[in-house]
């Protein structure tokens, strides 16, 4: 009798696997970090073979720690860092180049060329995305143009492309299945999210052969089988990490919004079955493909959130441990007029300025370590407010609450300041591993382990609610200062 679902959670800095039981308890967790590769300024890569090795290793480890037999596993669900691009030889199964990570800016010149040709409007209207180096399409083109022999192999049908989910399914099934789901496809900048097919106009412009691309399916269905300790286990859930978190937060209704505070910060609002094109710098993406229906979401991606705390710790050496952030932030009553704009790799939504760079402004002789640490924390919340304000304007839906998850949502100071600055209650669930939980739910629903979405909604439990306490005058004053600081950071690297 199957009693468990295993979630594979392949992130930007680590590979994880979590075994969940029917009652959503985390029976075991295994995690392993892998190498971050920075060949040049603004370039970020991963070794796809190392991603596979670490991910399969922690999958086996989590099962072993839980003491679970393969026949007790109902299904495997996959959630993954999105946009990160792998191209491999379908005959050898070997990547022809390192995976180009979502954070990598090397393809900014390709994006500039697309804009010069006037393709940005077409791409926005059909993929829901803005033309940016963040997405997969230009990364595929770069690999084909710059790896010797790649273009010839691609034209012969010998190369395959995949986001990380596709790469993992290919490896788990022994090269039998080349597939992705709607949520991951919607992040490539080459997938038409209105017509639900790879977009031939964009493929032609980027010179990407259709033969490289995976089949696109629902986020909850049986894609293939993984061989786990001699038994075949269905792989039956796939969603990009942020869509998976929205699903794990039971964000099934129009207007439901969540913010995941990780390396970056990612806000998604469910907008239902109708496509809305943002007029305020957001992207439209596929929230989920479930039971043959597509739901859309508005998304704002903040490139640097938790990563700003790592920078304060590792580069400025103002912290010994990231866990100390809240302690220092609450030692002072405010930032003493300091703002930190962490535009280390440009600014994401709603600005989309590839050439913005980080800045620290408002420094006087009286500014100390705690002020700068607090400014770093507040920057995470300000960037989220930028996105949420744009969402409300686009959707016409007033936010009733914001559900939160991800590592930094455990920081009570940050959650209270987030509530204060958006003037909306912030809800933190008992289970904050919602990204992995979403993948588990999708996998479990496909095989009947859980019954339906209503059952999942009933399982969502609140741990703590944060309510706004700032006056309108104070809130506006703080936010005006932030907007001024953002202007200082823009267009810096031109």
UniProtKB/Swiss-Prot annotation:
It holds the Pfam family FGGY_C. InterPro entries: ATPase_NBD, Carb_kinase_FGGY, Carb_kinase_FGGY_CS, FGGY_C, FGGY_N, Glycerol_kin. CDD domains: FGGY_EcGK_like. GO terms for biological process: glycerol catabolic process; glycerol metabolic process; glycerol-3-phosphate metabolic process. Glycerol binds at residues 82-83, 134, 241-242. Inhibited by fructose 1,6-bisphosphate (FBP). It comes from the Bacteria. Pathway: Polyol metabolism; glycerol degradation via glycerol kinase pathway; sn-glycerol 3-phosphate from glycerol: step 1/1. Sn-glycerol 3-phosphate binds at residues 12, 82-83, 134, 241. One of its GO terms (cellular component) is cytosol. Disulfide bonds: none annotated. Gene3D superfamilies: 3.30.420.40. It catalyses: glycerol + ATP = sn-glycerol 3-phosphate + ADP + H(+). Keywords: ATP-binding, Glycerol metabolism, Kinase, Nucleotide-binding, Transferase. ADP binds at residues 12, 16, 263, 306, 407. One of its GO terms (molecular function) is ATP binding. Belongs to the FGGY kinase family. This is Glycerol kinase.
């Amino acid at each position: 009798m199957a009693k468990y679902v295993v979630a594979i959670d392949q992130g930007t800095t680590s590979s994880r696997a979590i075994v969940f039981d029917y009652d959503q308890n985390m029976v075991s967790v295994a995690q392993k970090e892998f190498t971050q590769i920075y060949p040049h300024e603004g370039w970020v890569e991963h070794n796809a073979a190392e991603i596979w090795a670490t991910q399969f290793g922690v999958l086996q480890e989590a099962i072993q720690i839980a003491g679970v037999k393969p026949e007790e596993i109902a299904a495997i669900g996959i959630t993954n860092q999105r946009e990160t691009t792998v191209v491999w030889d379908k005959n050898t199964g070997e990547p022809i180049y390192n995976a180009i990570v979502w954070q990598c800016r090397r393809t900014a010149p390709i994006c500039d060329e697309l804009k010069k040709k006037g393709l940005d409007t077409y791409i926005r209207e059909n993929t829901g995305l803005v033309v940016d180096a963040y997405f997969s399409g230009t990364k595929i083109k770069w690999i084909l143009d710059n790896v010797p022999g790649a273009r010839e192999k691609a034209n012969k049908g010998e190369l395959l492309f995949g986001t990380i989910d596709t790469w993992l399914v290919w490896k788990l099934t022994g090269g039998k299945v080349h597939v992705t789901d709607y949520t991951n496809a919607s992040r490539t900048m080459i997938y038409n999210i209105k017509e639900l097919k790879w977009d031939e106009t964009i493929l032609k412009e980027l010179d990407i052969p259709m033969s490289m691309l995976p089949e696109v399916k629902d986020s909850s269905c049986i894609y293939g089988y993984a061989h786990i300790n001699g038994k075949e286990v269905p792989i039956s859930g796939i969603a990009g990490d942020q869509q998976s978190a929205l699903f794990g937060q039971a964000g099934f209704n129009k207007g439901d919004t969540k913010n995941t505070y990780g390396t970056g910060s990612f806000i998604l609002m469910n907008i239902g079955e109708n496509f809305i094109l943002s007029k305020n710098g957001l992207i439209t993406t596929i929230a989920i493909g479930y039971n043959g229906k597509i739901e859309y979401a508005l998304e704002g991606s903040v490139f640097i959130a938790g990563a700003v705390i790592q920078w304060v710790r590792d580069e400025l050496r103002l912290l010994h441990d990231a866990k100390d952030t809240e302690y220092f932030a609450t030692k002072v009553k405010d930032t003493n007029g300091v703002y930190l704009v962490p535009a280390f790799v440009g600014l994401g939504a709603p600005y989309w300025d590839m050439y913005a760079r980080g800045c620290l402004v408002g420094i006087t002789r009286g500014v100390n370590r705690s002020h700068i640490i607090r400014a770093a924390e507040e920057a995470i919340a300000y960037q989220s407010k930028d996105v949420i304000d744009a969402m409300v304007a686009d959707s016409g839906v007033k936010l009733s609450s914001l559900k939160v998850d991800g590592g930094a949502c455990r920081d009570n100071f940050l959650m209270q300041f987030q509530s204060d600055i958006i003037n909306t209650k912030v809800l933190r669930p008992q289970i904050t591993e919602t990204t992995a939980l979403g993948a588990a739910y999708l996998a479990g629903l496909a095989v009947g382990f859980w019954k339906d979405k209503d059952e999942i909604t009933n399982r969502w439990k609140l741990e703590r609610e944060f309510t706004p306490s700032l006056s309108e005058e104070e809130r506006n004053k703080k936010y005006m200062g932030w907007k001024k600081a953002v202007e200082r950071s823009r267009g810096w690297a031109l």
